[in-house]
Amino acid sequence: MSARTKEKTKDKTKNDEQTVSTEASAADRNDREKSSSSEPEDNAKETLTKKDSSSKKSVDVLAAMIEQKVQMSGSAGLGEFFGRMRPEITDAFFAALEREADVSKVVPSSLSKLDDGQVVDLLSVGEERTLSQSLFQLEVVTSIPHFYQLTAKQIGALGAQGGYLKAYHGEQVYPFIDPVANQFGRGFDLAYVRINTSGQGVELFIDPFDFDKVSCKVGGESLTGIGLSNAVGVDEITYDDVKTPEQMMEFVVLLIAGAAKMGRFCSSGVDARRRRKLFKTWVRRPVSDNFRHVQGWLLEDDYENYPHVPEALTVFSEYQWFAREVADNMTDNGLGTSVQMEDGPNIESFFNRKYREAAICNLDFITAEAHANVMEELQNEKMNVSAYVDLLQSCQMGIFDIEGDTDTIKLKVYMREVEDYEAELTRMMLFPGDQLYVDCLRTAALVSPNIRQFILSVLIQQATSRVGLIELLPVAEMTASLTSRDNISVSHNMALTLAIGEWKELLRLTNPQQICQKIVCDIMAPFVDGLRMEDSLGVPTPSKLVFSLLGAKVALILTPNLYDYNLHLKAHLVTMILSCFFPDQYGALIASRGYGHDVTGNRIDSIRDGERTKKNCRFATYTVLDPIPNGPPDRTRRKWLLMKRVQEWLLRNDLVRRREIRDIIYRPYANVLRLPGQTYLPRRQAAGAPLPCEVLLNDAIAILEEYRTVFHHPNDRNQGPQDRHALTTLSNLLRWYTRGFAEWFHWVYRPLYLQIALHPIIFWSHRLGQGVWRQFPAVREDRERRFDNHLEGVPFDSPVIAAFEPDVALNPFTLRQGADLLGRVHAQGSTFRGGAYDSASVILLSEYEALYRMTDSEGMVDEYIKTLMASRQLLEGLRLVAELSTGELLRDTPILDYIRTAFCEGRFPSHIFFKILNLFGVKINHGVLAQVGERSIEHRLRGDYRVYYPRPGFLDPALEFIPDRIVVVDPVRPSVRRNVKLIMDAVFDPEFGMIKMRKGVTFSLRPTNDLTFSSFHEIPPIQVEMTGNVNYVYDSETARTRAEYDVQVRWEAPGRIITMNLLVTSSYEILSSMEDILGREVRAFSFVVQDVSKFSGIYYDFMLSAVRKEHAIVWFPNLRGILHHHAISIEKVETCFKAAELAQFSSFLSLRPTALIKLNVVQTTNIRGGILPPSVSKPILPCEGVHPSFIFALMSMWRRIGFAGLPSR
């Protein structure tokens, strides 16, 4: 998405070269805008799996730049390993970056640990299957979407007889005549509608006459049937013998996911010449005068599969481009206002095509309502163009970010240019500008490791795209200036040669990719848990001291945030220097104060091997990072004070600057980032005005002089003339290295760092303070909701730290890497090159101006939008699962009672929980998030796996969870909630739903002479319940043992209900006893089975005997079933159902209370022809029946369900 913005610059000088550069930049941006706009003719699915061409171009450029660097440098690589980057690694790296930039790859979280030396996880990217279409994406449809499908059944002997509707001329003019005639032109027994979606984002098929073919598919997940057969070894899923509710739950989950995608379509697009059109594909049959009024404005429809007669009306158009389009293309065809009456109809009296547009109305009411819900929601997300321009500008460096004569340069400035079509299309441009999106990003980055991984990869891509601006010299060129002075070789000095060898031995070669990587890691320092690596500096010498100090200081300067958020690494760095060069003094310091203190203030006198990360570290403070006292007043005091000076110098960093990104509409939270230093406009530094970084580094040379004096007296026989000469040479020449590094740092590194730090995807701030480094970002479940629902084992029950897995690649620069960068970095126009004065160097301000202007604001904002939408989609999925697991989501829906009874009141099945989360793009497992991995097997088996929407916050040094003040209460889009209710009603509504659930089942063999879908067995008023007591009595007359059943009989009397217990052996005794009590004839009674799980075999034979004698019916008031409709002839009722339902009655013995059974209901009045029997018996029927609204006696009745609904309210 891009606004109509025009890039303008402030002309500070009349530099032709800069003007040309500006024009080229503008041309590039125009090309990018053209390439980023997708053609409407492109396949919608292709746009989901491919990046836009601008991002593809940037990845290609990135690939070319890195490949060039690999060829030029033998040490190029990614991460902390040496050697040339292998082709398979580079291919995977670029492919990973390209895939990670797609929002569909953001949602499934990746919990795998990164391999050593990697920042982008090359192994897990792209492995997880995700939704092929984002739940937030609008699809441009090529045909009118449908939810319902009108069809007919020809069943009886006379069902296919009748005249054929033939409309000769009409079938050639109207595209809908033939399909309607073919479907309904001959005789048919009944017409009905079924759910068979198209263009909805969900493939749902529900035929109330054939439930075995029920299917639902959303993205990569699909389900056939709504029940799972219990037969062992049966592979196919059938509707019969439904005894477990899990698959129904999965079906409901798929419906909810489908509701999140329903209605997200639009029918406007552009043609090949980039002219805006109302629809992509038009119907063109200009034959009939009546149809000519709407020809060209009805979208193509699938009349073959969805036979219907379309309707259309006109509404006023709000767009000027529409009026111009009509004026250009419709004036000469008889529909323009400028034509005469004899050339065509009077448009002024009919409808004015220049001011109105046709609106399709042949959407069924479900599709229309779902579409209206989405469109109404999107109306609230119209782009604020001015705010969008401000967002673009916030990604750019400002004049105040640069120190120097900034009048000689010009920076990139975005300004809004209002044009005619922009003013009109502003209503159509959407932007996730609601503050809720930003809140979702802040929360999702803590909940999902993959969101953090995506942010890391985005910033890595931005940083690595600038890798060509970083120049590193070969090691040989770096040390060449030390072996000669004023073109005179000094290599005969063995002490100097040894010093140079010490420097080379200290080095760990670094490449430009690692520098870009460390910039990103330093920005993301709050989420990095550094991994401490053991190292030793070896034998202490004065020359090694200065190289170590400079290397350590360079590392601390370049990555200040990583060290400040990982004090265990900073303490290790300082310890490594102090213990090597001041062993006695360091030992005395540790002996007197210990290594540090924990959070309770207890002294720590030992370091454990396992304390390599701050997560596993006991320390709250370190002795080597605290102020060191002045030391004992003895002969070693000077050494102690020198150690104190070294420690203070290492910990002092006056270069760090705070940069506040101000609060604007589309970046609603101001954040403050700590930057390594200040950007200086390149210029020749006067003798008395060195750069701040140079001043700071030169203190190490002064320390070297003092160290020689304190530890190696000039008259010390261990230090000969060559040693003193070598150190003097180093002291002089190292100033050239520090100046060259300082120029690179202030001219190149700092602006590169700032450009990455200005990315809008960065939502956090860098904080400092006592104990901040031990404040871990974390998430935790809502304890109150968990306790209210009496749950154990829920995910995030204990606080889960939101940080990257410890990895060397995420660590800050080390001392050895700093020693390498000190001598090898080089900036364009720098005074010194590898410690040698470069008299031919010339500063080209145009190159640095290009550096300041190279930020692609549109690309950064595009990545920001993807992350915002992916974050909300993630939290929306979590919230929907949370509300589904407690039943809140299905409140006021027909399915609520069943879902609450089957799932919410008992243990939530873990495999259903994982399937739900995976469907919504959330991949977790109980070992990582449920915090039950180390608990007992019994606890894991009893664990109730459901999500209650974790809250963001952080763990303080005492590991207490502190909730964040910003809480995303409800990330679910209103349209999703409305469409969930809509689709649940369409599927499960007792009146017009396709799947009608009924509570209450009756079993009877009483005959009837006709059956309809609303037929039911009448329940006699006398109710009999089995108490469970059975006595077996021996009958001496018959020499047999008979069973006596204790039954409780209940009937109504005026004003009261009478209950009586009887001891009977047969149904005759019940009837006779009740006749004696009531004083009247009693023909039948009803057995009542309240709990189907207590329906035992002892009662089965007794009840079945009474039913066969037509003395009783069996009533299961709490048993649930689904109505399965059959339209058959009455002569086939007993053949099809009697024996099967007698067997089904016996299967009730093994049902659970949450079971769903198949309730076959029959319609015999529609079928014509055949032999009519006098009566039939249909054993199992629901307690109450409702005539289904999806069946119509006449063709015109299809309009009852709203097929003429509007696409918007």
UniProtKB/Swiss-Prot annotation:
Keywords: Capsid protein, Coiled coil, Inner capsid protein, T=2 icosahedral capsid protein, Virion. It comes from Colorado tick fever virus (strain USA/Florio N-7180). It is found in: Virion. Function inferred by structural homology with BTV-fold inner capsid family. Its main location: virion. This is Inner capsid protein VP2. Residues 1-17, 26-53 have a biased composition (Basic and acidic residues). Homodecamer; each decamer is made up of two conformers of VP2, called VP2A and VP2B. 12 homodecamers assemble to form an icosahedral capsid. It comes from the Viruses. GO terms for molecular function: transferase activity. Inner capsid protein that self-assembles to form an icosahedral capsid with a T=2 symmetry, which consists of 120 copies of VP2, with channels at each of its five-fold vertices. This capsid constitutes the innermost concentric layer of the viral mature particle. The keyword Coiled coil applies. Residues 1-53 are annotated as: Disordered.
